[in-house]
Amino acid sequence: MSIFCLAAYFWLTMVGGVMADNPERYSANLSSHMEDFTPFPGTEINFLGTTHRPPNLALPSNGSMHGYCPQQTKITTAFKYINTVISCTIFIVGMVGNATLLRIIYQNKCMRNGPNALIASLALGDLIYVVIDLPINVFKLLAGRWPFDHNDFGVFLCKLFPFLQKSSVGITVLNLCALSVDRYRAVASWSRVQGIGIPLITAIEIVSIWILSFILAIPEAIGFVMVPFEYKGELHRTCMLNATSKFMEFYQDVKDWWLFGFYFCMPLVCTAIFYTLMTCEMLNRRNGSLRIALSEHLKQRREVAKTVFCLVVIFALCWFPLHLSRILKKTVYDEMDKNRCELLSFLLLMDYIGINLATMNSCINPIALYFVSKKFKNCFQSCLCCCCHQSKSLMTSVPMNGTSIQWKNQEQNNHNTERSSHKDSMN
């Protein structure tokens, strides 16, 4: 419940903060439209236009063409800083939360199993996005231009940014699918108690997920380039998708539908299918004595299934507004419509909400695990308390023959914690 309240808070924050067009805001999302990279106000191309422009594009400065809204729009300073604060909060929470989650799974042997390995893979993908992509987002928001836009490093960032962006989302989507399949396998073989350790098939799945995510993101690295264009008599450069081959033109035409189908619908359909099969298995297999003997084991598996389902629901809530905005823009918008600017205002509002909710998905999974899973909650608390205890011990410990009593006690406490955590490890 706390997770949904947090999401609602950010939603209302963005509704209240959106004042006008945001030409400087590079969207941390699945879209690669030209408007997301153009830092210049006053043109409709900033929001809808097209992702393909010739290298020597000249934009009219009088706004008289049908493709431009008559009134120049600009973003308020307050809205800039609201978005900056939100991005910085997501950066801190995402970095601390995902790094702590990885540390918990790495340091506790009892946590090294199939489901937790997939959750660690999910956290690592989110951590990469938070550490690398979010700082670029904040820079574009405040500076109103692409970083290092006049040298080779800017070109490198122009290709790296969308590549990592799409790879991170692919890692999230495929890990959620793998978790759903893993939960079905666990229930289908519910009489088998899994030991500690990562199964070989799970390790193969994780490697395949990362390789496939990188492969699917290659068109982003190929298509995005620094494109010079003239605006109000000045030559500028911006990072955008510039289709120069038939394949890239095809990719550009079907991109919105491809993103919606593969990166959004697929994990939801996969979860629905395998959770339906899992429910049927649990209803059909009711062996009385064996079921009683494994009742505690089944409770643990149900808790893991509930955790995975919660992660999928959060993913859907965070990404749906953004995909809805892109699909509406693809199907409803008409350049020749005289009332298109009113539609743009509505779609822009949805775009901002979707962008921030989608970005928030990179930091919310550790929070969800804290509230949904008792074992992860205990591990998070133990990890944080351990860090505080270590800091205090370093200041108060008394050396004895080159050692410290506190370190010995801490080692004993860690051994007891690991032994107690082994009793309720996820299966």
Swiss-Prot record:
What GO cellular-component annotations does this UniProt entry give? plasma membrane
Keyword Lipid metabolism in the entry? The reply is no
Under the heading InterPro entries, the entry gives: Endthln_rcpt, ETA_rcpt, GPCR_endothelin_rcpt, GPCR_Rhodpsn, GPCR_Rhodpsn_7TM
Q: Where in the cell is it found?
A: Cell membrane
Does Disulfide bond show up as a keyword for this record?
A: yes
Q: Which residues carry this modification: Phosphoserine?
A: S425
Q: Which residues form the signal peptide?
A: 1-20
Which residues bear sugar attachments? N29, N62, N242
Q: Which residues cross the membrane?
A: 81-102, 113-132, 160-181, 206-229, 257-278, 307-328, 348-372
Where are the disulfide bridges? C158-C239
Q: Where is the composition biased (Basic and acidic residues)?
A: 416-427
Region listing for Disordered, in residue ranges: 408-427
Keywords of the record, alphabetical order, are:
Cell membrane, Disulfide bond, G-protein coupled receptor, Glycoprotein, Membrane, Phosphoprotein, Receptor, Signal, Transducer, Transmembrane, Transmembrane helix
Q: Name one GO molecular function term.
A: G protein-coupled receptor activity
Which segments sit on the Extracellular face?
Answer: 21-80, 133-159, 230-256, 329-347
Membrane topology, as annotated: Multi-pass membrane protein
Q: Cytoplasmic compartment: which residues? A: 103-112, 182-205, 279-306, 373-427
**Some GO term, biological process aspect, for this entry: which one?**
mitochondrion organization
Q: Which domain of life is it from?
A: Eukaryota
Under the heading Pfam families, the entry gives:
7tm_1 (PF00001)
Q: Which family does it belong to?
A: Belongs to the G-protein coupled receptor 1 family. Endothelin receptor subfamily. EDNRA sub-subfamily.
Could you describe the subunit structure of this protein? Interacts with HDAC7 and KAT5.
Instruction: Sum up the protein's function in the record's words.
Output: Receptor for endothelin-1. Mediates its action by association with G proteins that activate a phosphatidylinositol-calcium second messenger system. The rank order of binding affinities for ET-A is: ET1 > ET2 >> ET3.
Q: What protein name applies here? A: Endothelin-1 receptor
- Please tell me the species this chain comes from: Mus musculus
